[in-house]
Amino acid sequence: MLPFKLVYSDAYYLPIGNHVFPAEKYRRVRDRLIVSCVADAADFLEPEPANDRDILLVHTPEYVEKLRTGTLSLREEMEMEIPYSRNLAEAFWLAAGGSILAAQQALADRVSISIGGGFHHAFPDHGEGFCMIHDVAVAIRRLQRDNKIQTAMTVDCDVHQGNGTAVIFAGKRSVSVPQAGVAGLRMSHTRPGRMRGGHSSEVFTISLHQHNNYPLWKPPSSIDVDLPDRLEDEDYLAWLDKTLHIGLRQFKPDLLCYLAGADPYKDDQLGGLALTIDGLKKRDELVFQVARSRHIPVMVTLAGGYAQKVEDTVTIHTNTVVAAKEVFT
């Protein structure tokens, strides 16, 4: 039995047909965890969908109405890059509910993992890049509204920059400063983003991503690390370690939201980095070890993963749970 809870529903499945996004990966990760005896049935919690009040903490009423009524324009649907359906919208509402539940559990158990979520390309008023609702942002804003947390940090290790995250949590920004090195570290000299309505609840955003990849426009996070093509394990882990310590010297979050994307993998169809499966597990271990040493609860979502062999994506996501078990046991 795990010392923390996993959040999962069969209804996490995204009904998008033949698509590069492996919609079946969530179920396959759940099955692998049970078959390999990493987890048992009692470790899983079933989420409820987020309600519209929660969704509206992040998304505009006009956008939510379009999603509820199926009235997205053709351009809006094409920008989202997945075919709209009522069932698809319901799956995203459920993913947001799953991230809320995982965040709540993380405060109780030090860590919790949603076997889904991480839809970081969703903006307040539109979706992009396979993302309709920004589940992580909804979870953060819900916990802030409930006075469970004041501050949060997002650590996004998907191969693609979290453009939606950066915009949602944007503070008052000045010029980003590029620094020399193997990769480019851009730090925005700003306050972290404040909640709508002038509340003092703040969010600090970190993104490590391939520079020469989607999205073309990368709005500034609190810290962006622009990684070069085909970066391998050792250099990636060095940049991650450096970035975490820089961020945590500047900001003390009540909750760390970790987007554990599988797409920095060397054989990912939509990525251009060169991490190995072992290197990605070490990445997860590093994030968990840093958070544990500083007594920061961690909520995890799976984010992207498009390996040529779906089994590799499943292994990478499964290893995230294994790494959490090893660090937090």
Where are these regions (language model features)?
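Active-site rim/adjacent substrate-binding subdomains
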Residues: 2, 53-55, 100
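N-terminal low-complexity, Ser/Thr- and acidic-residue-enriched intrinsically disordered segments
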Residues: 1-50
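A general "terminal functional-core" signal
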Residues: 74-329
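Short glycine-centered helix-capping/turn motifs at secondary-structure transition points
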Residues: 33, 37-40, 62, 70, ...
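Glycine-/proline-rich flexible loop or hinge segments
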Residues: 10-16, 49-53, 75-88
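Short, glycine/charge-rich beta-strand/loop segments that flank catalytic centers
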Residues: 46-53, 114-120
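Charged, often glycine-rich, active-site loop that binds/positions anionic groups
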Residues: 48-72
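Acidic carboxylate-rich catalytic motifs and surrounding loops in phosphoryl-/glycosyl-chemistry enzymes
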Residues: 41-52, 299-308
